[in-house]
Amino acid sequence: MPLDRVEEVHRKLGLAQGLIDSAVGIVVHRRFRDGDDSDPVIQRRHDALVRGVAVLDGVVRPVVDRPDMGSLAVAVALEFLDFRLPDFDWRGIASELPSWLGVIASRPSLVATQPGIEQPPF
């Protein structure tokens, strides 16, 4: 990782981790509370998702040949939202992220590790 981009990469890593943390909290709550989203904790987690996506929309750069760890983490977090919280319309919050994700998610490494894709034997 280039030293001049360490802070940028760590910022994206932190934001991606925050999205995943909030999303997992909502998923677990729904599984054990019959999908009741009226709990204030769930509302706080939902608000954190909205804020995180809005911030990331202004942070991501065009995809390059070798994306950094932060970009990969953001892509995984957004795909996790699609997979586990399909009712959360993060694309309605972000203007740049949907097209950015379309490009980075087409990388062979991300395509090969999507849920439901058969993994090659080792």
Annotate the PLM regions:
Residues 1-40:
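GST-like domain detector, emphasizing the conserved glutathione-binding G-site
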Residues 2-6, 62-69:
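Structural motif
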Residues 21, 31-34, 81-91:
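Short helix-capping/linker segments at secondary-structure and domain boundaries
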Residues 58-66, 108-113:
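Surface-exposed helix-capping loop/turn segments at secondary-structure junctions
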Residues 92-115:
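C-terminal end-helix/capping segment
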